[in-house]
A protein has these predicted regions:
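Short acidic-hydrophobic, aromatic-tinged amphipathic segments that line or gate anion-handling sites
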Residues: 117-124, 213-218
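Redox-cofactor binding/interface segments in oxidoreductases and associated redox assembly factors
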Residues: 75, 136-137, 160
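C-terminal hydrophobic helical "lid"/dimerization subdomain
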Residues: 146, 190, 194-241
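Local beta-strand N-terminus motif with an aromatic residue
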Residues: 22, 70, 131-132
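Mid-domain Rossmann-like dinucleotide-binding core that forms the NAD(H)/NADP(H) cofactor-binding site
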Residues: 39-122
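A short acidic, Gly/Pro-enriched loop at the edge of an enzyme's catalytic core
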Residues: 126-135
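Glycine-rich phosphate/adenylate-binding loop and adjacent beta-alpha elements
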Residues: 1-32
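Glycine-rich phosphate-binding loop and adjacent beta-alpha segment
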Residues: 143-202, 239-241
Length: 241
């Protein structure tokens, strides 16, 4: 995942490789994992974002140098990665002080039905400055980075996963004076993916019934709803007709 010549289908960095929606693709057999018996093939696509979330959570735990069940956690974003971070923290890492933030009321409601954590809008007074030990920014906007640095406790950790805006202002003074650890993370290791398949096949993260399935010819409509902020479901999987 740290390879400078990494190739991802449908991505253009670091090397462009189109084909994310191709009917057939050719990949090295070393990149193929056998589907566990207990994992439904319709739910299997969630393994990829789950591995991303697991990698991020464990990077944060390593940097924080203490168990995540003894920390105050803030998750920015209620999409698939944000919800999966919450599920991993709650059900696998046994964290019990988590706040998930999203401006989309519909998405907050969807996340709330699958998490025991607080799900709040960004302007809620419970989102305090200098309070959270670790923050997961799954959005990657300038405003979410600014909110992260405001809310993180001295000596805390910010895990930056989202890629919405690649640049912008950031309070480097606080980051420097209060020894904030900022980690960018993308993708996962083979070990992360294997661990993810085990978690999913053993239902550690729950039933995954928050996934919504739509026909492939409804894909453009789904992307528009996500872009417009009118989509409530954290994850849509397109099924070929």
């Amino acid at each position: 995942h740290l390879c400078g010549k990494r190739i991802l289908l449908g991505m253009n960095r670091p090397i462009e490789r189109q084909g994310g929606f191709a009917e057939l693709v050719s990949i090295p057999d070393k990149n193929i994992y056998e589907l566990p018996n207990n994992l439904d093939i319709k739910k299997a696509p969630i393994a990829e974002p789950t591995a991303v979330a697991l990698h991020a959570v464990e990077l944060g735990e390593e940097a924080l140098k203490k168990p995540l069940n003894k920390t105050k956690v803030l998750i920015l974003g209620g999409g698939a990665i944000g919800l999966l971070c919450g599920l991993i923290l709650e059900k696998y890492k046994k964290s019990n002080e988590i706040i998930l933030v999203d401006p989309n009321e519909k998405r907050l409601k969807a996340c709330k039905s699958h998490l025991n954590s607080k799900t709040l809008k960004p302007d809620n007074s419970l989102i305090k400055d200098n309070y959270f030990d670790i923050i997961f920014d799954t959005v990657g906007l300038e405003i979410t980075r600014q909110n992260s640095i405001k809310s993180v406790n001295p000596g805390g950790v910010i895990i930056h996963i989202g890629l919405t805006q690649p640049s912008g202002t950031f309070n480097f003074r606080k980051a420097t004076l209060q020894e904030i650890t900022f980690i960018g993370t993308y993708c996962y290791t083979n070990e992360d993916f294997e661990k993810t398949l085990n978690l999913l096949s053993n239902k550690v993260l729950g039933s995954l019934n928050w996934i919504e399935y739509r026909e492939m010819n409804k894909g453009a409509e789904a992307f528009k709803q996500i872009h417009d902020g009118t989509c409530s479901t954290p994850k849509i999987i397109l099924i070929p007709s």
